[in-house]
Structures are given as structure tokens and as C-alpha cells.
């Protein structure tokens, strides 16, 4: 029939449900008398946004393009990065009313078959009317829907999605959403940036260390300040203690009211700066914080050192690469503040222990959230900090991939004259013997 209809994308359809589905997504259906088969011709021409640079995951050195709302554009972008016949892209629809098109992408020679089967099982067993975005789908297929911790990675960058595909993960694309879902994921994935693989390992590890410090400051600093000023003044140097007491002398409120008021005010400023148009939003954020902080100190509502604590905490929260992990830290931070006010270091220790228990019990598609640390899977001690690119020989062992090895033990064969040359010495212009090899 392709010889009769000059169209590249022609498919046979024999059931009315398939025919109606194709009509709804904009295909043209051709019926021929005396033939019991309809021909679905891809003739749709929806308007769509062109490929643009990433808005939220910007990098200095890396690809400057992002996913769009069109599923076929997104799959072609992934196919361009992973130009291999083993890349499988399976289509399915979700939602009894919207019939939203989704694509499940994986490398069939790398990804674990049980992982792929589990992802497809969850997607095919959703009894729901509509799915509009990948964020809605994420809430339906994650392991623990009541936990505020993110359990899947979400990205707008095709190069990041391609990197995770090649490591053995599964990528799910939802039509109408410029963000794709990557599964499974572990905790350290949320502290990694899309730019890390493009940097030398020294630079990337410095940034990873800074993010790790920012994580603990964002989580613990306000609670520790409350605990120390309320219960553990003896650990503060004498001069600093006198400065703190003097700064709080004219403040009429207890420390818990003071810090909660400033934290909530900071969250209000952050939310306001996001919701207004971008040129005004930056101005509101800067001016609002300056005016509010200065006025609060002059009116003796809060102490100057508390303004510093809240400002440092707010700045470090912006250093967390993943938006959803940053949200989780902003919520849990209030629990640490209250625990520090009620019981000092003991209260913070109890909340921290409970937090660790939650992290240890959480799974993402059967993979422990704290892998490869808990459980310790690992011959591989390069779980968080990155080794040099030439030394990243194995894929993550907790993914149980079909091909654990991704690089040869000696990947830079040119350096040792391996392959097609009998000289095994490193090349040097100063060594005349090399020129004769």
C-alpha cells in the first residue's frame, strides 16, 4: 500500500479504537471500498515551539538546547545523541480521556530487563482520565507518593537524558511536557549538575564539595543556631556570645518567633520574585530582601546575626542543583528549627536520625535511595566524587546492567601506542626512538 499512497508514515488499522485514537491525535484515515483495513497517514501539522536553550539547567560548557512540548521532537533529540540501533523507544498512551502519548526509552543491550518491565508495568496499569504533564505522571508511578523527597530525576536537557540512558536507566517522555523523567535515581544524583561530566574531574569535584556543604548548611544551620543560643551557650566563644546577647537585648520576641518570621518572610520574597515577570522579579527579590532586613533590624524586631543566618541559608539553598530536593530541604528545615528550640542538640539528633531512617528505607524502582552507600554495594568508591573521565570504567553497580563495563581498562590507547603499533612507550618528541617505531 505504500506504493499507492505517497506518504512515508502509513500504518494499517483494523480496530475502531485504534482508528479513533489516530483521528484524535491528528492523523488522516483513508478507507478504501472492498478493503477491510483503514490506512492511518501521519498528516498532522500542529504548531509547536522551536528548540530553545534550557531555562533552568543552564551550563557554560555543554549543549545549549532543551526539550520541547512535542514528543517526536524530543525522541529525535535523544536519537541524535544516542546514535545506536540498541536504543529502543516504545510508545504508549495514558489516560482514558486525553490518551496522552508517552515514550519509554532505554538501551536494550544495557538496561536491566526487570527495570524496564517494572516501568512499563506501572505505566500500563494507571486507571485515570487524564495526564497533562510529566510532573503528574511522576506522582502516580513513584514508590512512596507521600514522601516529599524526589524519587525520579526530571530534566529538560537531552544530553543529560542521553548520559543516563547510557548508564542503564530508563527515560520516560510525556507529550506536552518539556521535562522528561529518569528512573531509577539515588540521592547523589540530585546533588549532581548537568555540567559535571563536561568538566575536568578537579573542577567537578570542587563544585560537588561546595554543593555538599550547601546541603548541610541549608538543612541544619537555622536549627543549630536556635539550639546553641537556647541550650548550648557554653560552646560559643565568649566575645561572640556577648555580641549575640547584645544584638538580641532589644528584641522583644523569643528566638523561635524571630527565626520563623524571617524564614517565612524569605519564602514569601522568593515566591513573589518567581511569580511576577522576570525583569521585575529580580528587582523585587533584591530590593525586598534589603529593605525588609534593614527595616526589621532598625525596628528591633530581629537581631542582625539572625539576618545573616537566614541570608546564608537562603543563598546555599540556591546552590542545590535539583529544584525538588531544594523544596524538600526548605520544608524539613522547619522541623529542625522546632526540634532545636524544644530540645537543643538532642532534638536535632532525633530528627536527623528519623531523616536518615527515611532515606535508608526509601527505594526508587527497587533501587535503594542511598545506594551505593546503604547498602554498600560497592567495589566502586567513586559514587559521589568523580574520577577522571578515562577512569570511569564501570556503570553504577546498583543498576545491575547487562554490560557493567563501559570503558576498556586502558581507554587512551594512543598514549601507550597500543593497537597497530609495536611500540608500547609513551610518545615524546624528545625520545628519538619513538619516531622509528
Report residues per predicted region.
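Generic detector of multi-pass transmembrane helix bundles and their immediately adjacent loops
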Residues: 224, 237-240, 245-419
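Cytosolic regulatory modules rich in charged/polar residues
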Residues: 1-255, 365-394, 400-435
Amino acid at each position: 500500500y505504500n506504493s499507492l499512497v505517497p506518504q512515508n508514515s502509513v500504518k494499517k488499522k483494523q480496530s475502531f479504537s485504534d482508528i479513533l485514537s489516530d483521528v484524535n491525535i491528528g492523523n488522516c484515515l483513508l478507507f478504501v471500498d472492498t478493503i477491510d483495513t483503514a490506512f492511518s497517514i501521519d498528516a498532522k501539522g500542529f504548531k509547536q515551539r522551536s528548540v530553545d536553550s534550557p531555562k533552568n539547567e543552564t551550563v557554560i560548557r555543554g549543549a545549549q538546547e532543551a526539550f520541547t512540548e512535542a514528543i517526536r521532537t524530543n525522541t529525535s533529540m535523544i536519537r541524535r545523541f544516542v546514535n545506536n540501533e540498541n536504543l529502543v523507544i516504545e510508545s504508549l498512551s495514558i489516560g482514558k480521556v486525553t490518551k496522552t502519548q508517552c515514550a519509554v526509552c532505554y538501551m536494550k543491550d544495557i538496561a536491566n530487563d526487570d527495570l524496564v518491565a517494572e516501568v512499563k508495568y506501572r505505566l500500563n496499569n494507571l486507571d485515570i482520565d487524564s495526564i497533562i504533564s510529566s510532573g503528574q505522571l511522576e506522582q502516580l508511578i513513584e514508590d512512596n507518593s507521600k514522601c516529599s523527597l524526589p524519587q525520579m530525576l526530571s530534566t529538560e536537557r537531552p544530553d543529560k537524558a542521553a548520559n543516563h540512558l547510557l548508564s542503564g536507566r530508563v527515560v520516560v517522555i510525556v507529550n506536552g511536557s518539556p521535562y522528561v523523567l529518569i528512573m531509577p535515581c539515588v540521592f547523589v544524583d540530585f546533588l549532581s549538575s548537568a555540567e559535571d561530566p563536561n568538566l575536568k574531574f578537579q573542577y567537578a569535584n570542587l563544585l560537588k564539595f561546595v554543593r555538599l556543604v550547601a546541603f548541610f548548611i541549608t538543612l541544619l544551620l537555622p536549627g543549630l543556631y536556635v539550639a546553641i543560643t537556647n541550650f548550648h551557650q557554653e560552646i560559643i566563644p565568649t566575645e561572640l556570645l556577648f555580641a549575640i546577647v547584645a544584638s538580641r537585648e532589644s528584641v522583644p520576641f523569643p528566638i523561635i518567633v524571630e527565626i520563623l518570621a524571617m524564614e517565612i518572610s524569605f519564602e514569601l520574597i522568593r515566591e513573589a520574585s518567581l511569580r511576577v515577570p522576570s525583569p521585575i522579579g529580580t528587582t523585587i527579590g533584591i530590593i525586598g530582601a534589603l529593605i525588609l532586613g534593614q527595616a526589621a533590624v532598625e525596628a528591633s524586631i530581629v537581631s542582625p546575626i539572625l539576618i545573616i543566618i537566614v541570608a546564608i541559608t537562603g543563598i546555599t539553598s540556591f546552590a542545590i542543583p535539583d529544584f525538588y530536593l531544594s523544596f524538600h530541604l526548605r520544608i524539613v528545615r522547619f522541623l529542625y528549627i522546632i526540634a532545636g528550640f524544644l530540645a537543643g542538640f538532642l532534638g536535632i539528633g532525633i530528627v536527623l536520625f528519623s531523616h536518615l531512617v527515611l532515606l535508608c528505607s526509601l527505594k526508587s524502582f527497587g533501587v535503594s535511595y542511598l545506594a551505593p552507600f546503604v547498602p554498600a554495594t560497592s567495589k566502586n568508591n567513586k559514587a559521589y566524587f568523580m574520577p577522571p573521565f578515562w577512569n570511569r570504567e564501570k556503570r553504577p553497580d546498583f543498576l545491575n546492567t547487562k554490560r557493567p563495563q563501559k570503558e576498556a581498562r586502558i581507554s587512551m590507547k594512543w598514549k601507550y601506542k597500543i593497537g597497530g603499533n609495536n611500540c608500547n612507550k609513551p610518545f615524546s618528541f624528545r625520545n628519538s626512538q619513538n619516531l622509528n617505531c
